[in-house]
């Protein structure tokens, strides 16, 4: 049997068409154990005691990004479209500061305060990634978000060396 790169197996699992959860846990544990270094990204502002992203080997775990405009310290606007665009710009800023870009994103988690905003968020979100190369995604409705934001987007990216 050919050795399949760990990230491919993880992606297949996230899509529901791959190995079992135990297999994925083993692969992730091996990836983390074999990672040469763990580094915290500090090139972006945060609003709490956490890193904007943590890199372990070829994986980059990006903390949730809200629609906070770094120039003003305020939310980009009250509408889902404006906050989604800004959250994605913030995600892009963290990615580019680490040598990654949107093409490296393999999974996103989107938190919405109101699932009725899903379609409008989806129009903006879909334009951020190259068509046909969308990451796996989970979208959940939550009761509240930091700074009373209406969307937060977290991501995992992979970049081969």
Show the residue positions of the predicted features.
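N-terminal presequence-like segments and the immediate start of the first folded domain
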Residues: 18-89, 93-106, 112-161
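C-terminal motif of bacterial Sec signal peptides marking the signal peptidase cleavage site
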Residues: 14-16
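Sec-dependent signal peptide recognition
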Residues: 2-9
């Amino acid at each position: 049997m050919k050795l399949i790169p760990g990230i491919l197996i993880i992606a297949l699992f996230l899509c529901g068409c791959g190995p079992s959860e135990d297999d994925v846990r083993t692969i992730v544990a091996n990836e983390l154990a074999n990672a040469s270094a763990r580094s915290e990204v500090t090139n972006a502002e945060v609003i709490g005691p956490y890193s904007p992203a943590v890199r372990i080997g070829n994986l980059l775990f990006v903390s949730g990004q809200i629609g906070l405009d770094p120039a003003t310290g305020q939310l980009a606007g009250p509408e889902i479209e404006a906050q989604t665009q800004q959250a994605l710009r913030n995600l892009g800023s963290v990615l580019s500061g680490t040598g990654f870009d949107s093409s490296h994103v393999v999974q996103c988690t989107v938190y919405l305060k109101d699932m009725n905003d899903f379609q409008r968020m989806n129009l903006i979100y879909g334009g951020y990634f190259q068509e046909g190369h969308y990451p796996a995604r989970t979208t959940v409705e939550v009761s509240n978000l930091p700074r009373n934001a209406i969307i937060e987007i977290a991501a995992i990216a992979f970049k081969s060396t």
